[in-house]
Design a protein with these regions (language model features):
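Single-stranded nucleic acid-binding surfaces, predominantly the OB-fold ssDNA-binding core
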Residues: 1-90
Length: 90
């Protein structure tokens, strides 16, 4: 299954750098896209590593991307948080 989303860029988050538990260095950035429909849909996507570092779009640009779903538990393991992680920008 291919998950695609096309929308207008409405927010560009700051680039964040961190080290994972297994010692890998990661770069992450969040972007928010909104559709131009009668009832607009808005979604926040996470860009990682090369996508985050090479992101050169501006607010208002139309972007099409492909993404995967990821879920991670909180520290207590009592609640899960979903993440939409982009893996290709068009």
């Amino acid at each position: 299954m291919t998950n695609e989303f096309t929308g207008r860029l409405v927010h560009i988050g700051a680039t964040e750098q961190f080290d994972t538990r297994d010692g890998r260095h990661m770069v992450s950035r969040e972007i928010v896209l909104a559709t131009d429909e009668q009832f607009p849909k808005t979604a926040c996507f996470t860009l990682r590593n090369e996508l985050a570092q090479n992101f050169s779009h501006n607010i208002g640009d139309s972007i099409s991307l492909r993404y995967d779903f990821h879920a991670r538990p909180n520290k207590e393991g009592t609640r899960y948080y979903n993440e939409l992680r982009a893996w290709r920008l068009n």
